[in-house]
Curated annotation (Swiss-Prot):
The lineage of its organism: Eukaryota, Metazoa, Chordata, Craniata, Vertebrata. Residues 96-138 are annotated as: Required and sufficient for interaction with BAG6. This is Ubiquitin-like protein 4A. The modification Phosphoserine is found at S90. Pfam families: Tugs (PF17840), ubiquitin (PF00240). There is a cross-link at K48 (Glycyl lysine isopeptide (Lys-Gly) (interchain with G-Cter in ubiquitin)). Gene3D superfamilies: Phosphatidylinositol 3-kinase Catalytic Subunit, Chain A, domain 1 (3.10.20.90). Keywords: Cytoplasm, Isopeptide bond, Nucleus, Phosphoprotein, Transport, Ubl conjugation. GO terms for molecular function: protein-folding chaperone binding.
Length: 157
């Protein structure tokens, strides 16, 4: 379906997306078209803010709909992220941006966005499942790699 995204500053773009597309994927496409970083975007439909994890169909957004884009000032975004982010929540944004660039070389924009979203979900799930034993094992491997190598050689005989 065809959508129009209009920024309050007057710029706008038309996008072709499936009706069940994720809002986060739409934001990625808007970022590419209007050169507005995803984290500074706030998309509105009929005055209601759209949540990244929801699909366009969840808001009854149909063909030829018009969405409004509010561009949040970078300072405000950084303050929000700093206040709401725990240290282990996610790797630095630069890591995700680098992964996104690599994916963009090998996939279409929509596919790259979906792969990146899945990687981020898998990363969060893996972190949330770490036990204290897992963390101790990882720490031992980093702090004492020679012991780990010796143990692995002993098992392979």
């Amino acid at each position: 379906m065809q959508l129009t995204v209009k920024a309050l500053q007057g710029r706008e773009c038309s996008l072709q997306v499936p009706e069940d597309e994720l809002v986060s994927t739409l934001k990625q496409l808007v970022s590419e078209k209007l050169n507005v970083p995803v984290r500074q975007q706030r998309l509105l439909f009929k005055g209601k803010a759209l949540a990244d994890g929801k699909r366009l169909s969840d808001y009854s957004i149909g063909p030829n709909s018009k969405l409004n884009l509010v561009v949040k000032p970078l300072e405000k975004v950084l303050l929000e992220e700093g206040a709401g982010r725990r240290l282990a929540d996610s790797p630095p944004t630069q890591v995700w941006q680098l992964i996104s660039k690599v994916l963009a070389r090998h996939f279409s924009a929509a596919d790259a966005s979906r792969v990146l979203e899945q990687l981020q979900r898998d990363y969060q799930r893996s972190l949330s499942r770490l036990t204290l034993d897992d963390i101790e094992r990882l720490a031992s491997r980093f702090l004492h790699p020679e012991v780990t190598e010796t143990m692995e050689k002993g098992f392979s005989k």
